[in-house]
Amino acid sequence: MELRYEKQPEKYLRSLDTTTRNKLKEALEKLKRFEGDIDRIKGKPNRFRLKIYHYRVLFEWIKGAIVITVIEILPRGQAYKGGRHK
């Protein structure tokens, strides 16, 4: 599978320190195999969230598609207060 990023996740990853950015990128590579702490977002077909440390990654995947679109990466607290999954 291929990962595609919207603008927010690209910008957010660039803003992080190198160590954190590398850890997140490693975990995102596993997402290509649909591995990790993944849950479907209720009421949003094709939308999922991935827990990576204290970050939440919102992504979209359509069954049968070869592309996963990373929509948003946020710290845990912000993700549940105002992320686009609401």
Describe these PLM feature segments.
Residues 1-22, 27:
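Arg/Lys-rich, positively charged N-terminal/basic patches that mediate binding to nucleic acids
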Residues 12, 47-49, 58:
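Short aromatic/hydrophobic contact patches that present stacked aromatics
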Residues 2-4, 22, 52, 60-86:
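Enriched for short, Lys/Arg-rich terminal
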Residues 15, 39-42, 50, 61-62, ...:
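Short histidine-centered beta-strand/loop micro-motifs
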Residues 26-51:
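A short, surface-exposed loop/turn module that caps and links secondary-structure elements
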